[in-house]
Amino acid sequence: MQIVTDKNKVALYYKDEATTYKEFILNTRKIKQFTKIKQFTNNMIYMENRPELLYSFFAIWDSRATCVCIDASSTAEEMTYYIDNSDVIKIFTSNMQVEKVKEALNILNKQIEIIVVDEINLNEIKIDENSSENLVINSPEKEDTALILYTSGTTGKPKGVMLTFDNILANVDSLDVYKMYEETDITIALLPLHHILPLLGIGVMPLLYSATIVFLEDISSAALIDAMKKYKVTMLIGVPKLWEVMHKKIMDTINSKGITRFIFKLAKKINSLAFSKVIFKKVSEGFGGHIKFFVSGGSKLNPQITKDFHTLGIKICEGYGMTETSPIISYTPKNDIVPDSAGRVIKDVEVKIADDSEILVKGRNVMKGYYKNPEATAEIIDKDGWLHTGDLGKLENGYLYVTGRKKEMIVLSNGKNINPIEIETKISSMTNLISEIVITEYNSILTAVIHPDLEKVKDEKIDNIYENLKWEVVDKYNQKAPDYKKILDVKIINEDFPKTKIGKIRRFMIADMLDGKIEKQERKPEPDFEEYNKIKKYLIDIKGKDVYFDSHIEIDLGMDSLDMVEFQYFLDLNYGIKEENLISKYPTLLELANYIKDNRNQERIGNLDWKEILNKDTNADLP
């Protein structure tokens, strides 16, 4: 594989050290020589993002063998499945992961060669550095299985997706027209390289275009921003969650002042990228000042985020695909961005929309099949060669729009079909108080399960988030929705939804979550001081539920307006605390108890007097 003509150009940065393309290729050849990888064998890579991951990856390819890339966060128990299913003969790993590999092999009672890259001293491996043979990385043959990647899946056991070298080349060739990379580009290996999107987009393509990759020691927002500034990063590939976090931080800053709100509205109206780049120069400088565009993939991006970043002078190009299509099916041209679309179908890929709106795909990029699973392969690729994505969508003016998941459609007892994503998007657009929402059928009725943005709730001093969302958001949605799409129940939760490792919500687990059947993380020891114990006992008595130090008083305990009136009176009576919006400021039991301990007046002992409560002006909006 001819990667680059200028061997002295920097290929990688890691721990403040630069690795040239010549050094990169030589290190790859040394790994190959040292590990003696056999042709046509399966070899596993199980390590965190680091240069040795790419050396090992290309050494496997150079040997015309198959690379099995596994998520470095996988547990030993999960590893037993991957090792057993993939028939690997070598496992490339790191000091950080090796104990989990040993534990998995012990469980399986298998002997497989473990190669710990930290223990390989590349400087001690002798190789002819001037030999032309050692300055080239060979690629597998087109029909060879180059990769086996396991789908995380929202249900069932992971399946090993077999991708040929030609599958991968098809995507590289098709994306060439978009000029994703140029020789002067610098990107960051932010996403884990066991996924096909970052593996291709961050691990392979930059090297084919003579660009530069930066590896981070610390995956944190501070480390990311520092690296973007230090290395003058020009392009970044991320998932929607990354852009959501960045968007929230930027927009919170803009909305905090009237003048910046006005400037943003003005820039939005003018709708000129050139104007926005000047007026919001500080935003660009916050990302290092050299960003050309961002790329988003993995799941659908909220179109408002795309629009707002455009108003800020930054392009986000969205792509759509799946592991089984190597991965890209459609991609957004950086000079023709259409928010809410997944871009244009890429060259040499055919897409058609089935009668039931499912997106079907055919092309060189479609996988060879699932490893040792012909039945599952036959379920997803029909006799005519069309791969059934399971996604719903439409084609308009050459752009592909993904509208939902086929298996996530809700079929009501009256036969009506409901696309939950459509309702979720609509309700989310009506308020800034929702962090995440899932529309599901629970106890045979259409239910909105909402995880609020608790920081926003606190900032806006909302004491009863349930009633705010129910009456100010969901009820207003219901007033305009057809009867069969009306939300009949609202559940507020104080925890993240169960998700796959790439952040997709496991919708089939929502009912179990609501029923309390999902095991929660072990809690820290309970605090033990007077105010905490007394408030906790009171809450247990009135709600009849388990109460913990991190329990959200309103959401976890289901406190309604009358409960809140009584509780506020309890705090007044016992601690002399009459402060407004107390629960929104200190929403958990421990936060509230600590505040009471530090701010209580002389305690007044007495029992609750309902006559006094009912005569008291509560200012509560009762439904």
Labelled PLM ranges:
Residues 169-186, 193-281, 290, 315:
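Conserved AMP-binding/adenylation subdomain of ANL enzymes
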Residues 20-22, 146-172:
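Conserved AMP-binding A3 loop
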Residues 34-74, 236, 275-400, 406-409, 423-426:
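Conserved AMP-binding/adenylate-forming
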Residues 131-150, 157, 180-186:
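Conserved pre-ATP/AMP-binding loop-to-beta segment of ANL
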Residues 91, 352-353, 363, 368-369, ...:
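AMP-binding/adenylate-forming catalytic core of the ANL superfamily
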Residues 37, 453, 505-622:
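Phosphopantetheine-dependent thiolation modules in NRPS/PKS and related acyl-activating systems
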Residues 438, 444, 474-528:
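Conserved C-terminal "lid"/linker of ANL adenylate-forming enzymes
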